[in-house]
Amino acid sequence: MSGSSKQPHAKGKTLIIEDDCEAEALDEANPFSFKEFVKSQTFPGFVSSNSKRAFSKDSNQSTTQFRGPSECPDGNLEFQETYFRDPTLYDDLQEDEDDDWSGSYHPSVIENTHGPKVPSPAGTDGDESYGYGASDMSGDGLITGWQQAVLPSPPAGLHGKTQHRPDSTSDSEEGLRLLQINCEELQEENLHLKSKICKLKELNDSQNEKVRQLERKLEERILEEQKEAQDLESMVQQVEKNLQMMTKRAAKAEGNVTKLKQEMALLQIELTTYKAENEALRRGETAGMNAVKQNSNLALENLQKVVSGAQSSIKQLVAGAEALTLVAELLRSIDKIAEIHNDGVP
């Protein structure tokens, strides 16, 4: 199969878990270790350049891909182990065949993006090694896959450098089983984090909506307060105008009050003079009234006398009038007798 070839060393290397110190040293030297992956998340440009240089040095070498017993219990997940030779230790590995091969474990979420593994051909001395093929060793694609996967780091004892020995297949199976468990835990944690992210997004959306509503309410409140402030300002101006008018009216009223007080004083003086005059007139009227009464009594007596004289003269006139009427009737009767006499004589 393309992308797989036999290792250049005569003696096969086995994968075992090394000590922490040696693992840390090899991690620092290996550009494809888990620490380099963490560095790629922090300094992506630096790791990308290092990985490109490492791939350029190893371009004439090939890796062998194997499919190990890494099937998950549910039959749907497959854990793949990548294996790369350290380009910085290439000369030492050529001189000493017993030196350790460097490798790094990566989460299955990252490794699944690089394609399936193929079984190794016969003649590998019974060793099981896991790695990428030559066609999968493009530095840019590998670094991009690491940068796209943001996962928590596995336990310290599970991501160090490992080696295989011909008689330690049980150790490799135990390591693979631990890696499978770690992969399942990481996948569960990934799902849990995704659900948390969804909940946080929903919470963020609701909070953003609340913020927008509060902003709208705040704007409306500010507009209302501005309108109320304008109304209050207009009311204050109107009140100030009213106060000015009231002060003017009060000043006018005070002037009128002073004038009225002066007039009241004058009127009181006049009233006192009028009262004195009335008292004097009353005193003078009493004396005049007595004289008027006497004169009126005399006039009444004279009038009674005149009336009695007038009544007697009236009686005389009535008697003369009756006599005159009697004379007139006699004259009329004489005229009638004369006419009758004249008519009776031939």
Swiss-Prot record:
Keyword field: Cell cycle, Cell division, Cell projection, Cilium biogenesis/degradation, Coiled coil, Cytoplasm, Cytoskeleton, Endosome
Against InterPro entries, the record matches this protein to: ENTR1 (IPR026757)
> Which spans of this chain does the record mark as coiled coil?
170-317
Which stretches of sequence are listed as region Disordered?
A: 46-77, 93-129, 153-173
Organism of this sequence:
Xenopus tropicalis
Q: Using the record, list the residue span of the signal peptide; answer none if the entry has no such feature.
A: none
Its annotated function is as follows: Endosome-associated protein that plays a role in membrane receptor sorting, cytokinesis and ciliogenesis.
Q: Supply one GO BP term.
A: cell projection organization
Compositionally biased intervals (Polar residues): 46-67
What name appears for this protein in its UniProt entry?
A: Endosome-associated-trafficking regulator 1
Q: What is its main location?
A: cytoplasm
What does UniProt give as GO cellular component? centrosome; ciliary basal body; early endosome; midbody; recycling endosome
**Compartments reported by the entry:** Cytoplasm; Early endosome; Endosome; Recycling endosome
Q: Which family does it belong to?
A: Belongs to the ENTR1 family.
